[in-house]
Every structure is written in structure tokens, then in C-alpha cells.
Amino acid sequence: MDNLKEFIKICHYLYDRKYVVGSGGNVSIKKDNLIYVTPTDSLLGFINEEDIAVVDMDGNIIKGAPTSELYMHLNIYKKRNGVNAIVHTHSLYSTALPMADKEIKLLTPESRIFLKKIGYVDYFEARSMELANEVSKKDEDVIVLKNHGIVCVGKNLMDAYLKTEVMEEISQLNYIIHSL
């Protein structure tokens, strides 16, 4: 699949920019009713094409060991037409501000254009069906998971990645403003 090279590149970008650390975060794309997803407990900065897990839309494993957040990905794909990629990170500022009960405001033209509106989900245990169900109820393309991280969805992987970058930048700006 041609998109796997881009998939790996995006995973490495996320790791290099510290949007994910350790084995946190995960990425997936949907193609022809198959989900290509990062493996469980993987370091995104070091994965290669052979590591990518593949599942069908019912969660049946075709190849590899998918992320423990698989059901969050599956639920989003099932409920959101037009979503073909998901990026879930534990980006520092995007995670920290909501922990301190600070709102992340869309302060720049770029953030208003690309993010439009931010969704929020209360804290649910990571890897839980409750979290998967709550996230999939949201219709925003950027969703803050309280005390956990963010989920960005897009029509393709570059779109979801762009939203991740813009979200972290606007979160950094919000942090600076809250600090003044």
C-alpha cells in the first residue's frame, strides 16, 4: 500500500516533535474497509512498515498486534463518514492546559480555519470502552481527552497530522497567554 510510507513518516514526525513519548499515542488510516494501525506498545519513532497492524472494521485481526486503543479508532470510523485517518497523541501543551482546567482558545486565523472547534471528553481510563464510546460521540475533528491527550481526525493522514500540529501550536500560545 502506497500510503504506508507516509504513515511511517508521520509516526516518526510525531515522535521527533515529542507529540508522543515512549509507547504513548497511536495512528491509523482506513482503506477499503481495512484499518492500518500502529502496533500496541510501540515507539512510533522507530516503527517500520512491517510493524503496522491490520484489522477489519469489526476488529478482526488480519496482521500484527494493534494498538490497545483500537476500539476508539474503530468507533470513530464507524460513526464518522469521511474520516479516513486518526492521530492520537499525548502532546504536552494540548494535554497540560485542560489538566489545569484552562480552555484552549482558537486565537489565530490558522487555528480557526483548520480546527474550527475543539471537542472535549471527560476523563475515562485509557484503553477503555467508555473512552472509545465517548470519543466517537463527538463530531469535532479535534478532541481533547481530559488528563490523557488529543485525538485528531481527517479525510487523510496529512489532514489529521496538520490538525495535530496546529492544535499543539495553539495550545502553546494559550499557555503563554495564561502565563502573562
From Swiss-Prot:
- Name the Pfam families on file: Aldolase_II
Q: What class of enzyme is it?
A: lyase
Q: Which residues cross the membrane?
A: none
Q: Which Gene3D superfamilies match?
A: Class II aldolase/adducin N-terminal domain
Catalysed reaction per UniProt? Answer: L-fuculose 1-phosphate = (S)-lactaldehyde + dihydroxyacetone phosphate
User: Keywords in UniProt for this one?
Assistant: Lyase, Metal-binding, Zinc
Which SUPFAM superfamilies does its entry note?
Answer: AraD/HMP-PK domain-like (SSF53639)
The cofactors named for this UniProt entry are: Zn(2+)
Where does the chain bind Zn(2+)? Answer: 69, 88, 90, 148
* GO terms, molecular function: L-fuculose-phosphate aldolase activity; zinc ion binding
Q: Which GO terms describe its cellular component?
A: cytosol
This entry's Enzyme Commission designation comes to 4.1.2.17
**Which pathway does the protein contribute to?**
Cofactor biosynthesis; coenzyme F420 biosynthesis
Does Lyase count among this protein's keywords?
Answer: yes
For substrate, which residues are the binding ones? 25-26, 40-41, 67-68
Positions of disulphide bridges: none
- Which residues are catalytic? 69 (proton donor/acceptor)
Coiled-coil region list = none
Q: Which domain of life is it from?
A: Archaea
Q: Does the keyword Lyase apply?
A: yes
Q: Which GO terms describe its biological process?
A: pentose catabolic process
Cofactor annotation comment: Binds 1 zinc ion per subunit.
User: What family classification does the UniProt entry report for this protein?
Assistant: Belongs to the aldolase class II family. AraD/FucA subfamily.
- Describe the task this protein carries out: Involved in the biosynthesis of the coenzyme F420 which requires phospholactate produced via the aldol cleavage of L-fuculose 1-phosphate and the NAD(+)-dependent oxidation of (S)-lactaldehyde. Catalyzes the reversible cleavage of L-fuculose 1-phosphate (Fuc1P) to yield dihydroxyacetone phosphate (DHAP) and S-lactaldehyde.
Q: How does the record describe its quaternary structure?
A: Homotetramer.
Protein name per the record: L-fuculose phosphate aldolase
